[in-house]
Amino acid sequence: MPRAVGLETLAEAVRWIRKRRLPVAFPFEYRVVAADDIWMSPMNAGPVASISMHQYERMPWQALFAEAEQLFRAAGGRPHWAKRHTLTRADVDALYPMAERFRAVRRRVDPTGKFLNGHLRELFS
């Protein structure tokens, strides 16, 4: 999300977690990251604030992650590609202006889709 709204967004997340008494097993990570020029990087709109939430695998995570994603997206955030998220192909197109060019390169260097799983196939085929 834009750096200017990062701390307030983190504070809002802490407020709703406390209000709903959601179980949290790990500390959140808050980082300020400079902009980059990588087509599909969440940081290419930078400078950005990055808030990472993790949950122990045996603890419920669905409510925590769903609310966090909604809050972070409303603040202009984009999820890390290696984390759980609910982006659709249309979301990717709206959030990443170079998405179709990325898909074209992906198809050229991996024509059989060897490096795609089911979710990535939906987003990048």
Outline where the language-model segments fall:
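Substrate-recognition/cap regions that form aromatic- and gly/pro-loop-enriched pockets
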Residues: 1-94
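Activity-critical C-terminal alpha-helical subdomain
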Residues: 77-125
